[in-house]
Amino acid sequence: MEKVLNKNEDIRLMKGNEALAEAAIRAGIHAYFGYPITPQSEVLEYFTLEMPKRKGIVVQAESEVASINMIYGAAGAGARVMTSSSSPGISLMQEGISYIASAQLPCLIVNVNRGGPGLGTIQPSQGDYWQSVKGGGHGDYHLIVLAPASVQEMADFVFDAFRLAEKYRNPAMILADGALGQMMEKVALPSEGSLPYSESSWATTGKTKDRERNIITSLFIEPEKMEQINIQLQEKYKKIQDEVRYEEIQTSDAEILLVAYGLSSRICQKAVDQAREKGLRVGLLRPITLYPFPKKIISELALKVEFMLTIEMNAGQMVEDVALAANGRCPVHFKGRMGGMIPSPEEVVEEIEILLEKHLSEV
């Protein structure tokens, strides 16, 4: 989980939001369109200060609805573009995100998740898992979703997200949370211009003598055509399954498996250490891609462990995908905090002990 820093790299102490924005500039984005909302406003602020120095475009739109439609237009013109928001702002973008997915345009959307539902709180949460991983907007579509667990990954995953978005012509999302956005850590920044950009063959360029004009649309009146587009999308999503990423921590001898992503996985890593000090053989599986989801490794580990416990900062969302992947091979339990509350390692260890005692009494 922790990156070894090279003394020759550009190493800085930065907030997660700032590291993400700086990485995006170094990834060569042409434009950023956004609207301020806590706890991700520093992303827009950083772009406003730095993008003009590097000949990029930054626009504070009048709303999140406007932001995502600016992304739609700029992506359709072949630009490398990004927006960011937090939970209720992402909800306002959902119609536009669905259009972008249907039109098969690459872009990066960042959700610095905060507590809800409703306007909620500005504290960190993982309550947007379903919204992010299951599509969120209308129709059968998926985003590629990456879940960072450190400020370093807030920067690194920008490059990964753009690579995947452009490889598959699909919107990608970095699903972070308010704590990761606000915390400060050392980060090794990538070199500027290290993510190559090439002219997009599918982009609209107006009239041209060199090729047929492209039409970017998500409107298909004939049901046969709409079904064919859906079939193409589903075939693409099958290919995206090859991009699954995860991290295993002390799973080789584990009898109890924690499953957690993002900030919760950092808490669980400490809980694993504390549990092992008590003689409990606990391991951790950390999904890095939430879509595609690491179903295969969960299915394999389910045959080796007594039970699984998912730790989330919500009422229980990823646990459903874990249970589906385990497919009855072992019990799957859930422990969560809601509304912006963060579970502690001690709470996790206590829950492990309670479940272990219950499990042993049933054997």
Language-model segments: residues:
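Conserved thiamine diphosphate
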Residues: 124-177
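Conformationally flexible catalytic loops at phosphate/diphosphate-handling active centers
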Residues: 40, 169-248
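Glycine-/acidic-rich phosphate or pyrophosphate-binding loops and their flanking alpha/beta elements
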Residues: 15-18, 234-256, 269
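Peripheral docking tails and interdomain loops at the edges
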Residues: 312-363
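Glycine-rich beta-alpha junction loops
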Residues: 114-116, 176-183, 262-264, 315, ...
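Generic long, charged, amphipathic alpha-helical segments
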Residues: 268-301
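Thiamine diphosphate
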Residues: 1-135, 142, 150, 334, ...
